[in-house]
């Protein structure tokens, strides 16, 4: 009996202890409205802040709108549009150039060494090369005097070493080419056979004994004939060289 009473007392004490904080929490969330002068001051401060913010925002928005629409709107917009268009065009041009453009070969502007190399890389006969020079030298190169000696063969066109081709710009500066086909070198191929004269032969036959005087006379006649031929050839070469200005 005593135990039951004691247990009831303990339970009652615990329930009473839990009820006290609940009451304290209820008292903590209770708000009190300021009265009198404090309430008026709080209302005034709130109103002043709201009015200041509204006035400032409205003035800034009005100034920005006036500046954009009436003063700088059209002028600024046009300048920006032009700038963007120009920039796009420049970017496109830069992007389109991806590699260097190869310049077409023009024999009319080549020196003899370059022409010799070029002739080994193309397969043109004389007529084709003449036509190429006439159509790729600004229309001023003459097809009849190109200054190139071409020998047709299975391997294509080849140039002789004895000819030179020079291209010079015309006085007007229009890129016209003048071809100089002057021959700079002459090659003479001669074959010479020493034959005894008829008089030397008859003397040699008559004097079969082989005397030294007859042999000397025959040799002298042959040498005289040979010297005459050489002198004649030298005179011809000198005359031709003087005519050509060599």
Swiss-Prot record:
Keywords: Cell membrane, Glycoprotein, GPI-anchor, Lipoprotein, Membrane, Signal. It comes from Candida albicans (strain SC5314 / ATCC MYA-2876) (Yeast). It is a lipid-anchor; GPI-anchor. GO terms for cellular component: plasma membrane; side of membrane. Residues 220-246 form a propeptide. This is Predicted GPI-anchored protein 33. Disulfide bonds: none annotated. Glycans are attached at residue 214.
């Amino acid at each position: 009996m005593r135990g039951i009473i004691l247990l009831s007392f303990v339970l009652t004490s615990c329930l009473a202890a839990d009820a006290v904080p609940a009451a304290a929490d209820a008292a903590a969330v209770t708000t009190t409205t300021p009265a009198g002068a404090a309430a008026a001051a709080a209302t005034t401060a709130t109103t002043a802040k709201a009015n200041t913010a509204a006035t400032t925002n409205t003035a800034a928005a009005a100034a920005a709108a006036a500046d954009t629409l009436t003063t700088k709107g059209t002028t600024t917009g046009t300048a920006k549009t032009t700038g963007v268009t120009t920039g796009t065009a420049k970017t496109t041009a830069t992007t389109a150039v991806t590699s260097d453009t190869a310049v077409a070969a023009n024999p009319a502007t080549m020196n003899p060494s370059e022409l010799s190399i070029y002739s080994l890389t193309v397969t043109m006969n004389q007529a084709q090369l003449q036509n190429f020079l006439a159509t790729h030298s600004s229309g001023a190169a003459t097809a009849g005097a190109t200054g190139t000696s071409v020998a047709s063969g299975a391997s294509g066109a080849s140039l002789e070493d004895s000819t030179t081709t020079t291209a010079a710009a015309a006085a007007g500066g229009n890129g016209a080419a003048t071809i100089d086909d002057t021959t700079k070198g002459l090659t003479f191929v001669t074959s010479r056979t020493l034959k005894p004269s008829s008089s030397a032969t008859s003397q040699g036959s008559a004097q079969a004994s082989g005397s030294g005087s007859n042999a000397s006379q025959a040799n002298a006649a042959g040498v005289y004939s040979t010297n005459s031929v050489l002198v004649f050839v030298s005179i011809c070469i000198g005359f031709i060289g003087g005519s050509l200005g060599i």
